């Protein structure tokens, strides 16, 4: 059985050497592995959240598509498409929006960061916050769930959004009484290559220290490598290879044998000028053929458009049947005679309280207690492994709710086991609201214990 892996490509900005080594190259290599059904999409709807310059969005879409294709992405082997070419994504986004609690979106890091920044400025909490930013995690969930991806490689800053996608999928499955969606696994690339920039810090446009991937051609690459900051050791003086970010750049693009030979040359006194020339030549050996292909693609956007349209058609063959099924599930299907409707399997008559587990962005494991209507009633403390979290969930079900759940102060409550606080409830507006939530949480635990 193949593992479906979905990778989203942000369509803002022009890729640099660090993007290639840290994301593009490893993702393309992974797509060639046996048993991998790889999906790659240009996340151009997401780009509108951050950028309102149409020319920049359009140019970035072209550059990103050309870059990935030039770097070796095989559209015959993978499914490569543009987000905006799949109308089923936005339809699914609305279906998911209708089952997603606002409280879940309130906890999204990007939204909370905007609120915190506004607080620091002394302006309204939601000043400048668009619905695109606020509901971004729902669109991301639609991207993933539409194709029932098994794995989604992300950076640590996106882990929360993957957990939200799982939560939303569980809510929908539970509400409509069937496993419509696979729960995607978060794949954090712990060994992602982080290249140093010209000044030794992480290569980033924010630091203005990037080395271009294709922009500026061979001359641009040579100019950038000549501007790499080095120490003051003269030719003939031994160099400390491990302390040199120039050596780290060379190592990221060379074989082990080449890397060892370059290291010896540095330790034997190779001058920095010669070292920069050697780095340029090694990079150019890899990048020149890709750059040639990139220039060819950029000058022929119609070819890229054809590739993306073929990918979109391939993706929609999978998306359309699922959306038809979902329409039927929520009552938006084709009108049928009463007899035909009666023959359809009945939806679950009632919803139940439930525990849902998730992995936090720091790698720890937690769980939530959700009411039948999806409202969060408890969130656990972090655990080192899922087994510990699961054991505590079972213990909470076995405990008398009145003993396990107690008021913490006037506006909050917590779950206690063995004299320790193991989970906490949401903060209420006042003592009355706290008591109502506490009663609801106790009722949910009692319901689980009786199940």
Swiss-Prot record:
Q: Which domain of life is it from?
A: Bacteria
Q: Catalytic activity annotated for this protein?
A: tRNA(Trp) + L-tryptophan + ATP = L-tryptophyl-tRNA(Trp) + AMP + diphosphate + H(+)
- Which parts of the sequence form the motif 'KMSKS' region? 202-206
Task: Name its GO BP terms in alphabetical order.
Answer: tryptophanyl-tRNA aminoacylation
| Binding of ATP, residues | 10-12, 18-19, 155-157, 195, 202-206
Location within or outside the cell: Cytoplasm
Place the motif 'HIGH' region on the sequence.
Answer: 11-19
Could you tell me which Gene3D superfamilies the record lists for this protein? 2.30.29.80, HUPs, Tyrosyl-Transfer RNA Synthetase
Q: What is the native source organism of this protein?
A: Bordetella pertussis (strain Tohama I / ATCC BAA-589 / NCTC 13251)
What is the enzyme's class at the highest EC level?
ligase
Protein name as it appears in the record = Tryptophan--tRNA ligase
Role played: Catalyzes the attachment of tryptophan to tRNA(Trp).
Q: Which GO terms describe its cellular component?
A: cytosol
Query: What are the entry keywords?
Result: Aminoacyl-tRNA synthetase, ATP-binding, Cytoplasm, Ligase, Nucleotide-binding, Protein biosynthesis
Binding site residues for L-tryptophan: 143
| CDD domains assigned to the protein according to its UniProt record, in alphabetical order | TrpRS_core (cd00806)
NCBIfam families per record: PRK12284.1, trpS
Checking PANTHER family in the record gives:
TRYPTOPHAN--TRNA LIGASE, MITOCHONDRIAL (PTHR43766:SF1)
The main location is cytoplasm
Q: Which family does it belong to?
A: Belongs to the class-I aminoacyl-tRNA synthetase family.
Q: One Pfam family name from the record?
A: tRNA-synt_1b
E.C. code = 6.1.1.2
């Amino acid at each position: 059985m193949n593992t479906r892996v979905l990778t989203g490509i942000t369509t803002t900005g022009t890729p640099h050497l660090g993007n290639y080594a840290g994301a593009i190259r490893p993702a393309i290599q992974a797509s060639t592995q046996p048993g991998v059904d790889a999906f790659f999409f240009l996340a151009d709807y997401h780009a509108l959240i951050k950028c309102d310059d149409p020319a920049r969005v359009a140019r970035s879409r072209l550059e990103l598509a050309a870059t990935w294709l030039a770097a070796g992405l095989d559209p015959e082997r993978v499914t490569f498409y543009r987000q905006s070419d799949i109308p089923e994504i936005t339809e699914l986004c609305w279906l998911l929006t209708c089952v997603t609690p606002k409280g879940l979106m309130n906890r999204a890091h990007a939204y909370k960061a905007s609120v915190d920044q506004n607080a620091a400025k002394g302006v309204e909490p939601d000043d400048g916050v668009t619905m695109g930013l606020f509901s971004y995690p729902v669109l991301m969930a639609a991207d993933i769930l539409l194709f029932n991806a098994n794995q989604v490689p992300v950076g640590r800053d996106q882990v929360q959004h993957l957990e939200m996608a799982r939560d939303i999928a569980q809510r929908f499955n539970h509400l409509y009484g069937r496993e419509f969606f696979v729960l995607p696994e978060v794949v954090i690339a712990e060994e992602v290559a982080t290249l140093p920039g010209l000044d030794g810090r992480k290569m980033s446009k924010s630091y203005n220290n990037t080395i271009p991937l294709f922009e500026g051609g061979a001359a641009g690459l040579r100019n950038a490598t000549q501007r790499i900051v080095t120490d003051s050791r003269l030719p003939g003086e031994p160099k400390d290879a491990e302390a040199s970010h120039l050596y780290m750049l060379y190592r990221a693009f060379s074989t082990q044998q080449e890397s060892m030979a370059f290291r010896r040359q540095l330790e034997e006194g190779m001058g920095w000028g010669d070292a920069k020339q050697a780095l340029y030549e090694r990079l150019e050996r890899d990048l020149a053929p890709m750059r040639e292909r990139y220039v060819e693609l950029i000058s022929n956007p119609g070819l890229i458009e054809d590739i993306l349209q073929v990918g979109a058609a391939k993706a929609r063959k999978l998306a359309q049947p699922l959306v038809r099924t979902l329409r039927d599930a929520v009552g938006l299907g084709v009108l049928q005679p009463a007899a035909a409707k009666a023959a359809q399997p009945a939806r679950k008559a009632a919803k139940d309280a439930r525990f849902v587990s998730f992995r936090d962005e720091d790698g720890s494991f937690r769980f939530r207690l959700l009411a039948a209507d999806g409202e969060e009633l408890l969130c656990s403390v972090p655990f080192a492994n899922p087994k510990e979290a699961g054991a505590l969930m079972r213990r909470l079900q076995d405990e008398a709710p009145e003993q396990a759940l107690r008021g913490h102060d006037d506006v909050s409550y917590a779950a206690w086991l063995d004299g320790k606080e193991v989970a906490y409830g949401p903060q209420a507006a006042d003592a009355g609201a706290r008591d109502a939530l506490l009663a609801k949480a106790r009722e949910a635990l009692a319901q689980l214990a009786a199940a």
